[in-house]
Amino acid sequence: MVRVAINGFGRIGRLVMRIALQRKNVEVVALNDPFISNDYSAYMFKYDSTHGRYAGEVSHDDKHIIVDGHKIATFQERDPANLPWASLNIDIAIDSTGVFKELDTAQKHIDAGAKKVVITAPSSTAPMFVMGVNEEKYTSDLKIVSNASCTTNCLAPLAKVINDAFGIEEGLMTTVHSMTATQKTVDGPSHKDWRGGRTASGNIIPSSTGAAKAVGKVLPELQGKLTGMAFRVPTVDVSVVDLTVKLNKETTYDEIKKVVKAAAEGKLKGVLGYTEDAVVSSDFLGDSNSSIFDAAAGIQLSPKFVKLVSWYDNEYGYSTRVVDLVEHVAKA
């Protein structure tokens, strides 16, 4: 049984907790969020506008939120170094704040007594692991790891399958991405990204993403071969990757479908999905796959030039992989 603590109770933190509570060998021991009181934590865990109401019992007292009779200790500490992870015997701290995402800042959890840390955001200094792609490279001496981003988790399994079978010479990715909490309900200040300050619910907003370049970190053979961008669109959840690639080997679209389907039914089952149905984004709400290949949406221009389409629930699929990575780290 791996004892975990969650730091940051936002969209990902709450879903990670929902998923972790379903796993027999994961025990959620503690939760820290300096901005949320216990009654509000319980409320936000129970009611979710996107994923629906939590099916079990949720309550709280002065020092806990209580889910289906299971008491989870709560803290409102701004500095993770001050958390009682040692006395609570925390094996893995899951940091879903988006703040402590580098080795030096995530180290605060180790200083507080956690044995290891899983960061639920891409990191420029912590090693990144994508389940189904490079998790076998994890070694037990690594104390702090990153689960990369939701978009990297969608793109990397597909890119790996395509590269292994046909070779990728170079490629461009676009993610058509649902709104997230960093965006604005009405036009407001966003000094680093002026477009990002525009009304989320009324615009298609071009944005940057490091997701494609990050694939090169988890798949070194693709280093420097992929880059990408994002369009933020007014949907609350579920996003889609368009991967347009120049291949090394000539092939047919039918052959690509066959290869992806075999991977989805084989070694990448549970990470990579496959559909030939006439689907739209809401069909993937609550889908636990990292990436679902849309066979009917892709197109081919020539034997070496294709556009491939893959869906992902950027909240639920990603949060499922966070818990998978926690279990993998605990076993190593």
UniProtKB/Swiss-Prot annotation:
Which SMART domains does this chain map to? Gp_dh_N
In this protein, the active site sits at C150 (nucleophile)
Q: Where in the cell is it found?
A: Cytoplasm
Supply the EC number(s).
1.2.1.12
A GO-annotated cellular component: plasma membrane
GO biological process terms on file: apoptotic process; gluconeogenesis; glycolytic process; reactive oxygen species metabolic process
Identify the residues that bind NAD(+): R11, I12, D33, T120, N314, Y318
Q: Fetch the InterPro entries from UniProt.
A: GlycerAld/Erythrose_P_DH, GlycerAld_3-P_DH_AS, GlycerAld_3-P_DH_cat, GlycerAld_3-P_DH_NAD(P)-bd, Glyceraldehyde-3-P_DH_1, NAD(P)-bd_dom_sf
Provide the site residues for: Activates thiol group during catalysis: H177
Q: What happens when the gene is disrupted?
A: Does not affect growth when ethanol is used as carbon source but reduces growth when glucose is used as carbon source.
Q: Any idea which positions bind D-glyceraldehyde 3-phosphate?
A: S149, C150, T151, T180, T209, G210, R232
How is this protein induced?
Expression is strongly repressed by a heat shock.
**Catalysed conversion reaction:** D-glyceraldehyde 3-phosphate + phosphate + NAD(+) = (2R)-3-phospho-glyceroyl phosphate + NADH + H(+); NADH + H2O = (6R)-NADHX; NADH + H2O = (6S)-NADHX; NADPH + H2O = (6R)-NADPHX
Q: Identify residues that carry Phosphoserine.
A: S302
Q: Does the keyword Ubl conjugation apply?
A: yes
Question: What pathway, per the record?
Answer: Carbohydrate degradation; glycolysis; pyruvate from D-glyceraldehyde 3-phosphate: step 1/5
| Miscellaneous | Present with 121000 molecules/cell in log phase SD medium.
How it assembles, according to the record, is: Homotetramer.
Q: What is the protein named?
A: Glyceraldehyde-3-phosphate dehydrogenase 2
- Lineage from the top down? Eukaryota, Fungi, Dikarya, Ascomycota, Saccharomycotina
